[in-house]
């Protein structure tokens, strides 16, 4: 993992560090996407989790963007690696981007809220 500020895989602007309830995330203050390191999504997916509520509230200030999901994204931590677009779970068919190198996930602005429903 690098110590440099990673760039947003959608808009290539630097991500902003956001700490919520002991969880370190990287948020794009332009498009509202969020980078979660491996296993961090599991800490936020429960609809009863207050920290997840706080992050969703922060991301809700960004309007859902018109996103080209056919465009393959590169991992903010490993820029040479193209992330895989996959279904979150059979019960929740939200598509997320996951890095095969580090297991981190990129969620577009409305995807965390959809996962937590």
Feature map (PLM): residue ranges:
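Intrinsically disordered, low-complexity linear regions
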Residues: 2-7, 66-77
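Cys/His-rich metal-coordination motifs, chiefly Zn-binding "fingers/knuckles"
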Residues: 3-4, 11-33, 39, 45
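Short cysteine-rich clusters marking metal-coordination/redox-active sites
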Residues: 8-11, 28, 75-78, 99
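Short Cys/His-rich Zn2+-coordinating modules
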Residues: 9-15, 52-64, 79-86
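Cys/His-rich metal-chelating microdomains
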Residues: 14, 31-34, 78-82, 102-105
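Short linker/helix segments within small regulatory modules
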Residues: 19-25, 87-96
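Short, structured motif recognition centered on aromatic/hydrophobic residues
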Residues: 34-36, 41, 105-107, 112
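Short, intrinsically disordered terminal segments enriched in charged and Pro/Gly residues
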Residues: 40-66, 116-117
